[in-house]
Amino acid sequence: MENKYTHGVLFYHEHSGLKNINQGIGEVTTALSSICKHLSIQLSENEGDIIKYCQEIKTKNYAKDVDILFILGGDGTVNELINGVMTHDLQLPIGILPGGTFNDFTKTLNIAPNHKQASEQMISAQVGTYDVIKINNQYALNFVGLGLIVQNAENVQDGSKDIFGKLSYIGSTVKTLLNPTQFNYQLSIDDKTYSGETTMILTANGPFIGGSRIPLTDLSPQDGELNTFIFNEQSFSILNDIFKKRDSMNWNEITQGIEHIPGKKISLTTDPAMKVDIDGEISLETPIDIEVIPNAIQLLTVNDL
């Protein structure tokens, strides 16, 4: 087979979520080396390293001929690479190989959840162009959330049960388990304002969160638009329905208790200040400014057969 690319760089963290990262590296390099004349394997020892390597690739200090990037890891590792590519304006395609708890965006790209299978899919995958979310000076592929979803992310980081991933089994006990905090919000979306009290606000680019599909048929990370959802205190009974369903459905069936507002530019303030979950990483607090950057990033995509 003819090599598609001159020089690929495969990034990974030692604590990627795979039980044996070195074995995992070996399993994916067979396929990746078949499409790259030269494949560099780059360990990221500390948070922020991948962003530094992206800067070196941009300035040609890393190598002069890098023309594709691969990442083996979970959503947090992928998020770091997205930030590196966007911050340093690297116009290079990215191949994502799942290696963590959740890889929500790989589902959007039709990539297999197993890293070895995913690497084999890279051989025939095509480059697709996708929107990116900008949050203050950070970037994300999939979602921005606060309230209940932050509490969930903190549970996962502590090694506790992943509430969102297990919602289908929890049902009506969600409210008791989580004891969610109400907060006041002021939201501006494309110059229209909204305010009130809520337990969770979610702005989504991709259709999968926590391993399940958001039941909104036309939600796409290629439409130049973001989708914001405001949950009210009566929403708990249908949270289960939303995250349990595996297929898209008519939003009108579950619209009670959830307000859905599409838009491109969003400003959000809360009282009190709230932590913000960006693709599973909690790194900001409100107030935040959010906008969609259309056609911002190139990702290897498996054709949906």
From Swiss-Prot:
Binds 1 Mg(2+) ion per subunit. This ion appears to have a structural role and is required for catalytic activity. GO terms for biological process: phospholipid biosynthetic process. It comes from the Bacteria. ATP binds at residues 44, 74-80, 101. SUPFAM superfamilies: NAD kinase/diacylglycerol kinase-like. Its cofactor is Mg(2+). It is an enzyme of class 2 (transferase). One of its GO terms (cellular component) is plasma membrane. The active site is at 281 (proton acceptor). Keywords: ATP-binding, Kinase, Lipid biosynthesis, Lipid metabolism, Magnesium, Metal-binding, Nucleotide-binding, Phospholipid biosynthesis, Phospholipid metabolism, Transferase. Residues 3-139 form the DAGKc domain. Belongs to the diacylglycerol/lipid kinase family. NCBIfam families: YegS/Rv2252/BmrU family lipid kinase. May catalyze the ATP-dependent phosphorylation of lipids other than diacylglycerol (DAG). This is Putative lipid kinase NWMN_0695. It comes from Staphylococcus aureus (strain Newman). The lineage of its organism: Bacteria, Bacillati, Bacillota, Bacilli, Bacillales.
